[in-house]
From Swiss-Prot:
Name the record gives this protein: Dachshund homolog 1
Compartments where located: Nucleus
Function: Transcription factor that is involved in regulation of organogenesis. Seems to be a regulator of SIX1, SIX6 and probably SIX5. Corepression of precursor cell proliferation in myoblasts by SIX1 is switched to coactivation through recruitment of EYA3 to the SIX1-DACH1 complex. Transcriptional activation also seems to involve association of CREBBP. Seems to act as a corepressor of SIX6 in regulating proliferation by directly repressing cyclin-dependent kinase inhibitors, including the p27Kip1 promoter. Inhibits TGF-beta signaling through interaction with SMAD4 and NCOR1.
One GO cellular component term: nuclear speck
Summary of subunit composition and partner proteins: Interacts with SIX1, SIX6 and EYA3. Interacts with NCOR1 and HDAC3 through its N-terminus. Interacts with SIN3A through its C-terminus. Interacts with SMAD3 and SMAD4.
Keyword terms: Activator, Coiled coil, Developmental protein, DNA-binding, Nucleus, Phosphoprotein, Repressor, Transcription, Transcription regulation
Coiled coil: 623-711
């Protein structure tokens, strides 16, 4: 990759020399070294390097002759390497790994517009792994096109097939043996794998999603690393892609995939996690969230929380400045939804120690590691007897974003701090006091500010552990009045005679900002089992602001009153009064000017504290959550009461229906018994009727047979008593039946 000419510092050009007839040098003392063969003279054989080239190579003889010609006849230009074409004029020589002389500047070769190879009169050596030449008279790392072409510098000039080099390799042969998918265990996770030619190959996109997604910017970065590491992944065939889609290893719309062996994946993983895998590359610099370039990242609904007031516009101590820069970096990374790389601390710290000018000029980089490194550097390079440093805004940063540094930490405080300089939260962990229903952006910003406060308080407490308790601490910072139009800090020109070098405590907000006790007694990090975040939320009012300028006379009295105040406030906040303390918390510093001891680095343009505003917002959210919980509880109680009443009504109705059912069953039993009796009586009447019918038939036959009147008279006389008896008996039976029927009708009407 060619570096733009605007970024290259101007180097002194050497006037063109007359042509020299030797091939050992082209401009007096200029020597060209190729990364392919390390010989200044052109070589006839191909270089011993691997990898395809971009175009079909020219014949070796012609390439060598053109290289030799360029080496011999280029006035003021560096000689080309083996198989590479030399530049002419002020453009420098081409890289030795390229077969086409016209591509010399395109593939890591030569200087740019300043004669990186040939314009200098000093010897030039090519960097390892690339054929770019850098002028030794220029110490800038951007004077040669170095880092981006290391993968293409090892190109081969041997005869290759005519197809382009960057075409996709042929996929795996579509055979049943190659298409057999298995789920294997890789670093504790199940990954899809295929066995191709006896080698186990795992799915690269799935492994990227599981292990590399939080380490690099994207899958394209992984492919760039694979090219640099000379690892060629295997291309899946159509059947393997279909199987991987069915397993969920790749997304439904993806129609291509690549496989990689376990060994190559371990190499890739180590390259992604190892900071030393990028030699010569400058550290990445993450911009602040509030910078104009990243303004599109912030949501428009939170202008108050993320206004430039988060970045302190006035004087800070080294600890508070580093903490503010670290918090801005944490917010930036959280808003980008990208985890912080663990190797950033060591890499950036080493980079800042090498380039100390940026740190000493006040360039508080917004990346976490850089802020830690610059804080350490300021602490180490500033003796304790130093008064104060005048902050100088870096040229690349706006004036409002420059973080000035007051007096340094003393050696006791510095020795107590962690090696990286800060106790930084690398991940945004959920907090029990923030409602789950908040938008993600609000939760992220609230967590960032709370971690910011926790970091400042932890550093203050850590510094206090090593300092004597009887020490009188004074601040050398004159706090800027809130209505000051200038964002630059106002520092004292000298120190008072009796003051000691110490870290000015940037305290968090208190429930009574007017109190100005001494800051020599720092609060403990944990008290009564509560974390620092809970105390900073306003649950404990013993977090005190810093001292005033003239507060030295009342030091002892303030010391005793604060001790009594802490003893009063040591009641456990896990009791039900914690809710009342949240409700009764009132931040009284809204309408009045803040005292000088209040942390003015966090002032908004309208004079309000950003921390105070944030805590007020969080308090309002908590109140809303509590009110919602109470309303829901009342609603649940009402619903319970209604359900209970419905249940009682249903129970009464059920009991009534059960009673009615029992009565109906009893009536049914009685009716069935009566029906049986009626059936029996009917059967008896039927039998009696049949008997009478038979007797009547017999009598009629007898009457027909009797001819004489005597016989009829005698028969009549004999039958009369029987007929009378039968009539009386039949009449009695009929009356009984009628009586029973009347009784049945009466009972039926009753029920």
């Amino acid at each position: 990759m060619a570096v733009p000419a605007a970024l290259i510092p101007p180097t002194q050009l050497v006037p063109p020399q007359p042509p020299i007839s030797t091939s050992a040098s082209s401009s007096g003392t200029t020597t060209s070294t190729s990364s392919a063969t390390s010989s200044p003279a052109p070589s006839i054989g191909p270089p011993a390097s691997s990898g395809p080239t971009l175009f079909r190579p020219e014949p070796i003889a012609s390439s060598a002759s053109s290289s030799a010609a360029a080496t011999v006849t280029s006035p003021g230009g560096g000689g080309g390497g083996s198989g590479g074409g030399g530049g002419s004029g002020g453009n420098g020589g081409g890289g030795g790994s390229n077969c086409n002389p016209s591509l010399a500047a395109g593939s890591s070769g030569g200087g740019v517009s300043a004669g990186g190879g040939g314009a200098s009169s000093t010897p030039i050596t090519a960097s390892t792994g690339s054929s770019s030449s850098s002028s030794s008279s220029s110490s800038s790392s951007s004077s040669s096109s170095s880092s981006s072409s290391s993968s293409s510098s090892s190109s081969s000039c041997g005869p290759l097939p005519g197809k382009p080099v960057y075409s996709t390799p042929s996929p795996v042969e579509n055979t049943p043996q190659n298409n057999e998918c298995k789920m294997v265990d890789l670093r504790g996770a199940k990954v899809a794998s295929f066995t191709v030619e006896g080698c186990e190959l795992i799915c690269l996109p799935q492994a990227f999603d599981l292990f590399l997604k939080h380490l690099v910017g994207g899958l394209h970065t992984v492919y760039t690393k694979l090219k640099r590491l000379e690892i060629t992944p295997v291309v899946c065939n159509v059947e393997q892609v279909r199987i991987l889609r069915g397993l969920g290893a790749i997304q439904p719309g993806v129609n291509r995939c690549k496989l990689i062996s376990r060994k190559d994946f371990e190499t890739l993983y180590n390259d992604c996690t190892n900071a030393s895998s990028r030699p010569g590359r400058p550290p990445k610099r993450t911009q602040s969230v509030t910078s104009p370039e990243n303004s599109h990242i912030m949501p428009h609904s939170v202008p108050g929380l993320m206004s430039p007031g988060i970045i302190p516009p006035t004087g800070l101590t080294a600890a508070a400045a580093a903490a503010a820069a670290a918090t801005n970096a944490a917010i930036a990374e959280a808003m980008k939804v990208k985890k912080i790389k663990l190797e950033a601390m060591s890499n950036y710290h080493a980079s800042n120690n090498q380039h100390g000018a940026d740190s000493e000029n006040g360039d508080m980089n917004s990346s976490v590691g850089s802020s830690g490194g610059s804080w350490d550097k300021e602490t180490l390079h500033s003796p304790p007897s130093q008064g104060s440093q005048a902050p100088v805004a870096h040229a690349r940063m706006p004036a409002a974003f420059s973080l000035p540094v007051s007096h340094p930490l003393n050696h006791l405080q510095h020795s107590h701090l962690p090696p990286n300089g800060l106790e930084l939260p690398f991940m945004m962990m959920p907090h029990p006091l923030i409602p789950v229903s908040l938008p993600p952006a609000s939760v992220t910003m609230a967590m960032s500010q709370m971690n910011h406060l926790s970091t400042i308080a932890n550093m203050a407490a850590a510094a206090q552990v090593q300092s004597p308790p009887s020490r009188v601490e004074t601040s050398v910072i004159k706090e800027r009045v809130p209505d000051s139009p200038s964002p630059a800090p106002s520092l004292e020109e000298g120190r008072r005679p009796g003051s000691h070098p110490s870290s000015h405590r940037s305290s968090s907000v208190s429930s009574s900002p007017a109190r100005t006790e001494s800051s020599s007694d720092r609060i403990p990090v944990h008290q009564n089992g509560l974390s620092m975040n809970q105390m900073l939320m306003g649950l404990s009012p013993n977090v005190l602001p810093g001292p005033k300028e003239g507060d030295l006379a009342g030091h002892d009295m303030g010391h005793e009153s604060k001790r009594i105040h802490i003893e009063k406030d040591e009641t456990p906040l896990s009791t039900p009064t914690a809710r009342d303390s949240i409700d009764k918390l009132s931040l009284t510093g809204h309408g009045q000017p803040l005292p000088p001891g209040f942390p003015s680095p966090f002032l908004f343009p309208d004079g309000l504290s950003s921390i105070e505003t944030l805590l007020t917002n969080i308090q309002g959210l908590l109140k809303v959550a509590i009110d919602n919980a109470r309303a829901q509880e009342k609603q649940v109680q009402l619903e319970k009461t209604e359900l209970k009443m419905d249940f009682l009504r249903e129970r009464e109705l059920r009991e009534t229906l059960e009673k009615q059912l029992a009565m109906e069953q009893k009536n049914r039993a009685i009716v069935q018994k009566r029906l049986k009796k009626e059936k029996k009586a009917k059967r008896k009447l039927q039998e009696a009727l049949e008997f009478e019918t038979k007797r009547r038939e017999q009598a009629e036959q007898t009457l027909k047979q009797a001819a004489s009147a005597d016989s009829l008279r005698v028969l009549n006389d004999s039958l009369t008593p029987e007929i009378e008896a039968d009539r009386s008996g039949g009449r009695a039976d009929a009356e009984r039946t009628i009586q029973d029927g009347r009784l049945y009708l009466k009972t039926t009407v009753m029920y």
